[in-house]
Amino acid sequence: CLTVMKELPEQSVDLILCDLPYGCGKTKHKWDREIELTELWKGYKRLMKPDGIVCLFGNEPFTSKLIQSNTDMFRYKMVWEKESPTGFLNSNYKPLSLFEDIVVFSKGTVGSKSKLPIRYYPQGLIQKEQVKRNRPNSTWRSGKGYGGNNKLNSDTEYVTHYANYPTDILKFSRD
């Protein structure tokens, strides 16, 4: 993939979705050799649009290597919970694996006032225009520690537009 990436035009890719070889020495397959992550990121950064996303699959210890290889662009991790476990050949020596990590990287940042927000389009939202009220004197929130002019300290109303936001655990049915 490192060779092919050099042929692609700069800043032309919205999403890089890849299940890299983990290269952890756990298999004897020729293809399971760890890719030089410095070179990989050099290629990814050249290809990505400014607000592009990189999603990489992994399991430990490879997940930690991925995150540490580019902490500046690391944004969050999701867990893909699979319907069927894997690793039956080693089931006498370790637990079966029922999940895989998905590590998300971007030049964009997470935050409502970001100059370059990360692309994020939550799916499956349920529209609900519900008026909610902030009550700073409720028993669970005393208002202390929020700063003098913080909206959490005042009795305010706001509208919740959607419900059913996704979590960082993903489940997909085979249907």
Regions found by a protein language model. Give the residues of each.
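Core catalytic lobe of class I
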Residues: 1-175
